[in-house]
Amino acid sequence: MEENWDTEIETEKPTYVPNFSTLETENTDNYSAYSNNDINNQNYDSERSFGNRGGYRSERSRPSNFNRGSRTERGRGRGFGTNRNDNYSSERDVFGDDERDQRRGFPGRGGYNGNEDGQKPNAFRGRGGFRNENEQRRGFGERGGFRSENGQRNFDNRGDFGNSGEEEDRPRSYGRGGFNNSDTGGRGRRGGRGGGSQYGGYKGRNEEVGVESGKSQEEGNEKDEKPKKVTYIPPPPPDGEDNIFRQYQSGINFDKYDEILVDVTGKDVPPAILTFEEANLCETLRRNVARAGYVKLTPVQKHSIPIIMAGRDLMACAQTGSGKTAAFLLPILSYMMNEGITASQYLQLQEPEAIIIAPTRELINQIYLDARKFSYGTCVRPVVVYGGIQPVHAMRDVEKGCNILCATPGRLLDIVSKEKIGLSKLRYLVLDEADRMLDMGFAPEIEKLMTKPGMPTKEKRQTLMFSATYPEEIRRLASNYLKSEHLFVVVGLVGGACSDVAQTVLEMRENGKMEKLLEILKSSEKERTMIFVNTKKKADFIAGYLCQEKFSSTSIHGDREQYQRESALWDFRTGKCTVIVCTAVAARGLDIENVQHVINYDVPKEVDEYVHRIGRTGRCGNTGKATSFFNVQDDHVIARPLVKILTDAHQEVPAWLEEIAFGGHGALNSFYAADSMGEQAGGNAVTTPSFAQEEEASWD
């Protein structure tokens, strides 16, 4: 169901900043932050656990002064937990529960039980059911369960990892949205990812660590249920020239860009330019370029800027971190400033001259900030629109005037269909990360956009596509949206990895990855590191585990709330967290300064994804390194294209990887046998739980 842009929604701002940062002092609570409203609106006694793995375990009680002690301890099973109450009274039993609460459980295992006065505590160890006065078991949730007072079944704002149980009419939880994942222990008929109607996450709405977003299958199955209202309003973008024009320092290899070969395919190619002066930018734009620290053109800029200024359609392929965003923003802004185009304020229907589309919220916001930087002090007004923020807030920003609309695909279609944005004046259509925009992930949205009323035909608009990778089938598909005489610029090799990144591939068994990861991080604790995994649950598990091991960590993926995603990136950019664990949502386009190391904890399934991941380091002439944990059993499909990427980038190719890539089935069988023997002899190595592969949801 689409969001209602026309209804005012009362703003509900988050009261804390979520992160996984490590303990600074012994008495610091790092996993939760309370406001006065939190204290007044919650039940103080709650337990949470992560089923079989021990996981996080948080226990809270309410001492008279509301102060909470902080203590970290190991939970049972494989995992970790926090105990937030050190003040057990004499009335409490061995599990730390008093007679009033009637909750019983095993730490790290879940399993709570409510019973009448005088009964002994009981718990269904490991299965976390609850018991009422009739001794009936309900809710065999493997992840915690819930309690009953006086025989009443409810979730009572607890946010427990409970299941919906065996009864169809079991009430849903509200306020703290607990886990209810069919993959992680759901036994009820109404399984799904998150029984709560609000935020969900590791611990619930006003707490910090999150594994799921609380997206319930109930919400999708019940047609009459209203979608959750989005109330988040992002903070305003940085103000003041010092913040707007913060410079990204180029590295020692920046001048080597001139050595990269450039190939331009097409007829009547405009000549390349060598300096910004040759671009004939207006004075204000030239001054903003200088303030931003741009001194020398990169190869993709030298060729793309004159092509766009000549009015030609363009498909450009250049390595990660080589200045593609400026390559299309500068000629677009130059045209608008030369034509004297200004924003028309407070019109119900805004008709931008340029629309820029990117696959992720973080990337499109980054492009918007660049457009805002280059257009500073002019009458050109860029606006950004993406999912996860309050619709009314976004619409008010659009109504103030919009010349350049930066948007994610789904939100763009929504705002166009509601006739808030018109397309009749569109001159430039830009697809950043074009291969991702045209694959099966976003192809239907792009096709819908092209057929919207008012969309100029490809003959009457200028279409620009940029990416670091272009599979052959995507290049064929792109021709449907480009003029027949479009140009194709290739800087270096199509789909090639950045040559400034030192790549290492390690053969690893699954149960040895965590130990190796800790070894790498301990040997370079001050390095800013991005760790990539293939599932959202694993991202949060690893981030939490690293936090327990005293590494300042956070995570970002499609199931986290938007303010959590923005906060995680901010913590990583500013150095508050030196490690961020990511899924594919952070693999493309993000330009984070001083990322020194990228670790592929899970090797991606496609080699193009590998190129984008390792491209988070080694940007703008800086050097970086990438380490990949290659599990032969899971990753052999990517072996041959990975060897080509390493060879083309002049990196060392391990002999075992070449054998897998070109040795046929016999080589694979021998590796499988060795891997199987290694698994049996693995001992007590720290093992990451196996999580089912899931699609990265909510990119938009």
Swiss-Prot record:
Residues 45-62, 89-104, 130-146, 215-228 have a biased composition (Basic and acidic residues). Residues 513-661 form the Helicase C-terminal domain. One of its GO terms (molecular function) is ATP hydrolysis activity. The keyword Iron does not apply. It catalyses: ATP + H2O = ADP + phosphate + H(+). It comes from Xenopus laevis (African clawed frog). SMART domains: DEXDc, HELICc. GO terms for biological process: cell differentiation; gamete generation; germ cell development; male meiosis I; male meiotic nuclear division; oogenesis; piRNA processing; spermatogenesis. Residues 305-488 form the Helicase ATP-binding domain. It comes from the Eukaryota. A motif (DEAD box) lies at residues 432-435. Gene3D superfamilies: P-loop containing nucleotide triphosphate hydrolases. This is Probable ATP-dependent RNA helicase DDX4. Its EC number is 3.6.4.13. Belongs to the DEAD box helicase family. DDX4/VASA subfamily. Keywords: ATP-binding, Cytoplasm, Developmental protein, Differentiation, Helicase, Hydrolase, Meiosis, Nucleotide-binding, Nucleus, Oogenesis, Repeat, RNA-mediated gene silencing, Spermatogenesis. One of its GO terms (cellular component) is pole plasm. InterPro entries: DEAD/DEAH_box_helicase_dom, Helicase_ATP-bd, Helicase_C-like, P-loop_NTPase, RNA-helicase_DEAD-box_CS, RNA_helicase_DEAD_Q_motif. The keyword Isomerase does not apply.
